[in-house]
Amino acid sequence: MRTNPLTTVRNLGILAHVDAGKTTVTERILYLTGTTHKRGEVHDGTTVTDFDPQERDRGITIFAAAVSCAWAGHRINLIDTPGHVDFADEVERSLRVLDGAVAVFDAVAGVEPQSESVWRQADRHGVPRIAFVNKMDRAGADLDAAVASIRERLHPVPLVVQLPIGTEDGFTGVVDLPRMRALVWADGADAAEEGPVPGTLREEAARRRRVLEEAVAERHPGALEEFCDRETLTAATLTGALRDLTRTGDGVVVLCGSAYRNRGVEPLLDAVVAYLPSPLDVPPVRGTHDGAERERPADPAAPMAALAFKVNATPTGRLTYLRVYSGTIGKGDTVWDAGTRRTERIGRILRVRADRHDPLERAVAGDIVAVVGLKTARAGSTLCAPGAPLLLEPPGVAEPVVHVAVEARRSTETDRLAAALARLTEEDPSLALRTDPETAQTVLSGMGELHLEVAVERVRREYGLEVTVGRPGVAYRETVGEGVTGFVHRHVKQDGGAGQFAHIVLDVEPWEQDADGDGAGGGFVFRSTVVGGRVPQEYVRAVEAGCRDALAEGPLGGHPVTGLRVTLTDGRTHVKDSSDTAFRTAGRFGLRDALRASGMILLEPVVEVTVTVPEDGVGGVLGDLAARRGRVTGSDPRGGAVVVTATVPLAELFGYATRLRSRTQGRGTFTARPTGYAQAPAAVVR
């Protein structure tokens, strides 16, 4: 059983834009907690959490890695998540099982595009956060500017609890504002030396503590009462109020440091323990059974319920990562998969330390562990006690937007390639496989060019297969331009047996989701305005099913159709020959023909790119973006460089990283994030 009480457990993720220092923060946490005995470095390829060869080669996090460590009597289950937009689904699956998060920001760049994306993902899941402004030792580092960008672009209430001591390369420590004590790190030291606030900073520290007190009192009734009585807050009251505001999402505690130089990570760990919630501090997990909503408390004695959020299908077996929400799960237990409605048997239970594992006899509510022995569980599967079924909501999976054709170089290895790709899609639900009906090629789809590069490289490295990869393509969509009214379709079939008869009249019109949807091309709505029972309800449902069948391939290029509303306005039946099958067929072919008359529009995926380039390279970058049909939306000077933002069709970005390096002599970088779909020009349609 657990040695830590549930109140001392923290399940948290490290979130950030790529290169903000997430993995370095994680490595310092592991080192300071005694989990590792050497500081892992991203640039040396010696990190614990980025243990995959590609992660070490590329210097970025690709796969969410779970680690467990201890600090100040607390068990911390930590997940280091990817920062690149192509792996946003890894972040989504991780956030689904976390109780809190540390958002890491670059002290020079502040909020970056993927910072916004992961922050909003955390908002959707209601995950409380604290912020860590990293790289305070860099030239141009500015805590106040970083906090301002957090406030302006992410819209939380930042509650800054530290004052930096020194600037840029002279950054040596912080003033802890709640306790009004200085923490200073000597070069190479693992621990800080604590002392009084330096005389040169006392006035500024007092002013900032006053600002912090006022911000907290304004939002916390208990703190307000003490502040009105005493005109100040004790350290205990301030800490307690900060904890409450963090857990309710009414404030975000902000700390700062330099993880690379080991400065500021100890206070960050203290803040994780002090401010982020335990499994008991978050609402009980909710699920459904037989259509009724049920709750499960974070109680080891309650019926067991767990969610699988990650699968590693290694050549030696499957590792399934679980968040246990309630109850206890033991080695050898039989569990119920609520999705497949099958029983599975738990083999080994492992405490995870990235690529190393410690065996456990059991796991209890609040634990994040890996188990061996599950054969059918996937990311998003609910496992529960057989006698107390419960289905938890799985993490969402985004639709792939880029695809490549993949073939084995040797025809004798086609079956091995199919098995390898199937194993990859088993691990990563954001990858999809299909066979092109015209070419019979295997097509692998994913979230971006890098996502697919990583998948193909895994096939080569892990399975020893030589593969040929086609040019990337994007996932186009088709939508309705003008629409059509009163379109009549009649389905009649007489072949000697039972006849088929269905007569329908359809209106087809463009439709967009609300503001919180994805705008143009935002889905499909079906309705019926038939009166007088001219088409029975069961046939109406069949027409809707047929219409949904027709959406799979549009008339422009066989792309999925979206962004339309179809209304069944009239119809006729035959006393003998009408059936569900007849009306479903009429719906499918009727809508297919109606779309041909509806002035269809081709939609292409569009991304927002953020290019950081030296000032002398801006002209070339702007010209290149224009040639790629890009629309520049902003250009901001930043510390000797210029940050250019633009919206660009995804299809035009293939190979852009190489082109940018060439134009800027290797000094330019860019990131991209999906923003939806937009109408493609006539040249693309042709």
UniProtKB/Swiss-Prot annotation:
Positions bound to GTP: 16-23, 80-84, 134-137
GO molecular function annotation: GTP binding; GTPase activity; translation elongation factor activity
The keyword Ribonucleoprotein belongs to this UniProt entry's keyword annotation: no
Protein species of origin: Streptomyces coelicolor (strain ATCC BAA-471 / A3(2) / M145)
UniProt-recorded name of the protein: Elongation factor G 2
GTP-binding recorded as keyword: yes
Annotated function: Catalyzes the GTP-dependent ribosomal translocation step during translation elongation. During this step, the ribosome changes from the pre-translocational (PRE) to the post-translocational (POST) state as the newly formed A-site-bound peptidyl-tRNA and P-site-bound deacylated tRNA move to the P and E sites, respectively. Catalyzes the coordinated movement of the two tRNA molecules, the mRNA and conformational changes in the ribosome.
Keywords: Cytoplasm, Elongation factor, GTP-binding, Nucleotide-binding, Protein biosynthesis
Main location: cytoplasm
Gene name linked to the record: fusB
One GO location term (cellular component): cytoplasm
